[in-house]
């Protein structure tokens, strides 16, 4: 399993010109949830995945496996009541060749916009100075994890 180092921000609105960036639809649901471990299935455009994530905060362990669409379809009903639908835009930021994943949520979470960026190491994550368009950082707030959003909706 590989570790990922991410920072997450909540935006007031999508960044101006976001439609000019590459994007894809995402539907994901949670098969099993625990406080620090999640098992999810995800459809990203035409590809389907099974992912296990463990940990909290900005350093998490993730294992993602591409699965056959038929397996996704078999698991999807198990996620009823624990799903999110969003459009993900890939937005480059700064001269460091960082790319933010800006998620514009749909359905029950319509209006929510969240941006995440993965960093190569803790030093890069610590050194990152966020641009003005990024909102409040919620990396360490478990209420903003996708699994929590799928279960409880947008935090107040």
Task: For each feature predicted by the language model, list its residue ranges.
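Phosphate-end processing signature that detects enzymes handling 5′-triphosphorylated RNA
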Residues: 1-156
């Amino acid at each position: 399993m590989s570790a990922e180092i991410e920072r997450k921000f909540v935006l007031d609105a999508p960044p101006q010109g976001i439609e000019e960036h590459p994007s894809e639809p995402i539907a994901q649901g949670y098969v099993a949830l625990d406080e620090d471990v999640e098992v999810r299935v995800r459809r990203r455009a035409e590809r389907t995945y099974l992912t296990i994530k463990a940990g909290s905060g900005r350093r998490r362990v993730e294992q993602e496996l591409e699965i056959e669409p038929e397996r996704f379809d078999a698991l999807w009903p198990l996620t009823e009541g624990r799903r999110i639908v969003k459009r993900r835009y890939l937005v480059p930021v700064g001269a460091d060749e960082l790319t933010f994943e800006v998620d514009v949520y749909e359905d029950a979470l319509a209006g929510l916009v969240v941006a995440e960026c993965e960093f190569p190491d803790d030093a890069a994550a610590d050194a990152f100075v966020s641009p003005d368009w990024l909102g409040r950082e919620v990396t360490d707030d478990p209420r903003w994890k996708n699994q929590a959003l799928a279960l409880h909706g947008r935090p107040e």
